[in-house]
């Protein structure tokens, strides 16, 4: 039984309000995650050349379960090694960079004002990716808020990855809204 007598398992009872009624909710906390160095490197090519660069998200959106996972980043060296496996064993010339929000890469959400991207960490990551010799790289997911929070970020990354009319790059955005009320209620760190 994985829940018996474990120090990382606990039940919190919290009071919150919904529709002017007090509700007592039970929340189960179970901390069972591997350390980053316990996650093995890939040894065979990944599908479509996709490599993971981070796990979790620090934005804390109320509708998303990814925010429940702790935020952790793979080093540029680990990412580079996995891309090299895809190149050598899979013949890939591109790298799909998987994350739940690429613009959170390298930041410490507990100290980062307004969740501004860590431009230095992102530039280091994409420089390492391109140093493998791939012709194209593309992040899988990101937020519009992260993309526009630093006006130099997108132009700098575009230069690093050689983006242009012959090398289009995009990012898939998840739930986004222009409503200030909804953002404040459900995603106040965007």
PLM feature segments, named:
Residues 84-190:
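Conserved SAM/AdoMet-binding glycine-rich loop
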């Amino acid at each position: 039984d994985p829940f018996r007598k474990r120090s990382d398992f606990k039940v919190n009872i919290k009071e919150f309000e919904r529709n002017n009624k007090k509700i007592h909710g039970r929340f189960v906390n179970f901390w069972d995650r591997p350390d980053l160095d316990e996650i093995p490197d890939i040894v065979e090519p990944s599908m479509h050349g996709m490599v993971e660069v981070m796990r979790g998200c620090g934005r804390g959106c109320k509708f998303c379960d990814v925010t429940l996972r702790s935020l952790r980043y793979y080093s540029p060296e680990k990412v580079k090694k996995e891309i090299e496996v895809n190149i050598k064993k899979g013949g890939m010339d591109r790298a799909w960079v998987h994350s739940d929000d690429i613009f959170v890469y390298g930041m410490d959400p507990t100290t980062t004002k307004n969740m501004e991207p860590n431009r230095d960490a992102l530039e280091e990551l994409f420089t390492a990716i391109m140093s493998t010799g791939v012709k194209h790289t593309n992040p899988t997911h990101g937020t519009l808020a992260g993309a526009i929070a630093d006006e130099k970020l997108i132009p700098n990354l575009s230069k690093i990855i050689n983006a242009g009319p012959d090398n289009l790059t995009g990012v898939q955005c998840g739930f986004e809204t222009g409503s200030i009320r909804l953002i404040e209620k459900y995603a106040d760190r965007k």
